[in-house]
C-alpha cells in the first residue's frame, strides 16, 4: 500500500509540475513579427576579433586555437576604417530596413562597453570606441531599425562548461576551468 501511495504521489507530481501553459504571443509580439516578415531585406553583421583571422566567429573552436592566445587578438584590434554612418547610409541606400549586429559571440568578446567584463572593444583594445553605440546613433539618425545578436555561450568565462563541440580543444580543461 505504501508503494502504491508513493508511486501515485510521484506520478501526480510529475504530471502537474511539468505542465506548461500554452504560449500566447502578445499583440506587440505579433505586430513585430509581421513587421519583420514585411521588412524582407536587412543586413546581418558578424564582426569581432575573429575577423582578424579572416575566418568566422567559430574560428576558436573550428581551428582548435588556444583560448588564452586567442584573447591576445584584442591587443591588436583596431578597425580604423569603421564608420557607422557610412555603414548605415549604404544599408539605407540599398533599401534595407534593419541591421542585426553581433554584439557578442561565443568567444565572449563584447563589441560594446560593458561593466560585466573588461573583455570588450572599449577596455581590451587600442580602438577604445563603443561601435554599438555609434551604430545605434547612426541607425536612429537615418530611421533604420537595429537588432542585436548576443550569445549567452561564453568560451571566455572560466566557469563555462563546454556543451557539444563548443569550446573544446581550446586549451581549457574538460570542466571549462
Predicted regions and their residues:
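Bacterial Sec-dependent N-terminal signal peptides
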Residues: 1-21
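Mature catalytic domains of secreted/periplasmic carbohydrate-active enzymes
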Residues: 20-177
Amino acid at each position: 500500500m505504501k508503494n502504491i501511495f508513493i508511486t501515485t504521489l510521484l506520478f501526480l507530481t510529475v504530471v502537474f509540475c511539468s505542465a506548461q501553459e500554452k504560449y500566447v504571443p502578445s499583440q506587440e509580439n505579433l505586430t513585430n513579427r509581421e513587421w519583420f516578415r514585411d521588412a524582407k531585406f536587412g543586413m546581418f553583421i558578424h564582426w569581432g576579433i575573429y575577423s582578424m583571422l579572416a575566418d568566422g566567429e567559430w574560428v576558436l573552436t573550428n581551428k582548435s586555437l588556444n583560448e588564452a592566445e586567442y584573447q591576445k587578438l584584442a591587443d591588436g584590434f583596431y578597425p580604423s576604417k569603421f564608420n557607422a554612418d557610412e555603414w548605415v547610409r549604404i544599408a539605407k541606400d540599398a533599401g534595407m530596413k534593419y541591421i542585426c549586429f553581433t554584439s557578442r559571440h561565443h568567444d565572449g568578446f563584447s563589441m560594446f562597453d560593458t561593466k560585466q567584463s573588461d573583455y570588450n572593444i572599449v577596455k581590451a583594445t587600442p580602438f577604445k570606441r563603443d561601435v554599438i553605440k555609434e551604430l545605434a546613433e547612426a541607425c536612429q539618425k537615418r530611421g533604420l531599425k537595429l537588432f542585436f545578436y548576443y550569445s549567452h555561450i561564453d568560451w571566455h568565462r572560466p566557469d563555462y562548461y563546454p556543451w557539444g563541440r563548443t569550446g573544446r580543444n581550446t586549451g581549457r580543461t574538460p570542466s571549462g576551468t
